[in-house]
Amino acid sequence: MRNLFSVEGKVVVMTGACGILGATIVKHFAEQGAKVVLLDLERTREVAEGLIAEIKAEGGEACFFPTNVLDKEVLEQNYTDIMAKYGTIDILLNAAGGNMARATVQPDQTIFDLDVEAVKLCTELNLFGTILPTMVFAKTMVEKKCGSIINFSSESALRPLTRVAGYGVAKAAVSNWTKYLCGELAIKFGDGLRVNAIAPGFLLTNQNRALLTNPDGSLTPRSHTILEHTPYGRFLEPDELVGTLQWLASDASKAVSGTVVVVDGGFDAFSI
């Protein structure tokens, strides 16, 4: 019987691959038989090499290329290297991005104190750090009229959240771009090209740990507020995203495009 969810033998390219989420995701796809390409900043090389060693020890296949998702010339070199190694790209995970603490109005500030330059930088990283890799890596998908692009949006794109103003604006733009690109690619290049996004809820990561936990590991008031509004009553775990990602990457979702899939333990759906 054919396995609709299979990604075996597929070439999966992931930007932002060396963070907590990225590490979990690339290991999952490698376990499923995909050939995984880790793209991240040069400073993450040691982490990447550790991940690759883990993957290869389990019989998987993976490689690392340092990148800068805001530098098209670097991305073009990545594309050349990937094509030389594997000859194709089947699945693109645009996960590079993140919040910037200065890109919001702090509790002791007003909107008139907003650091506009920080908001611009946050938007550039999250939005254009999604657009530019797509412009480069989707070329082979267009040529073969087949491929799945999965962008990383966020819960903060769905409703305005305090302390992440710039990040929320940027991720809302990623969601909008996802829907736009769905039509742009399918109409001009065929229905084998799909573009979707995942909008994760609250997970503890290196980026938000200081905001959500105290130095002793206990939860901050912000965390308690979040969990009170989450029907699951807990933070998500990184491995709770991989099933949705595999569905979007595989033929099981071949008629799904332009969709932002929310994985948040019910946060967005819950009301008092």
Q: How does the language model describe each region?
A:
Residues R2-N3, R159, Y232, L245-Q246, ...:
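Short C-terminal tail/terminal secondary-structure segment
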Residues N3-V37:
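Canonical Rossmann dinucleotide-binding motif of NAD(H)/NADP(H)-dependent dehydrogenases/reductases
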Residues A34-E49:
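Conserved glycine-rich Rossmann-like NAD(P)H-binding loop of the short-chain dehydrogenase/reductase
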Residues Q77-A84, A103-E124:
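Active-site Tyr-X3-Lys motif and surrounding loop/helix of classical short-chain dehydrogenase/reductase
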Residues G98, F112-I131, C146, I150, ...:
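Catalytic Tyr-X3-Lys loop
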Residues T134, A170, T178:
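Active-site helix of classical SDR
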Residues S154:
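Residue(s) in the substrate-gating loop at a strand-loop-helix junction
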Residues F189, R194, V256-G258:
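Short, small/polar-rich loop/turn modules that mediate ligand/substrate recognition or access, typified
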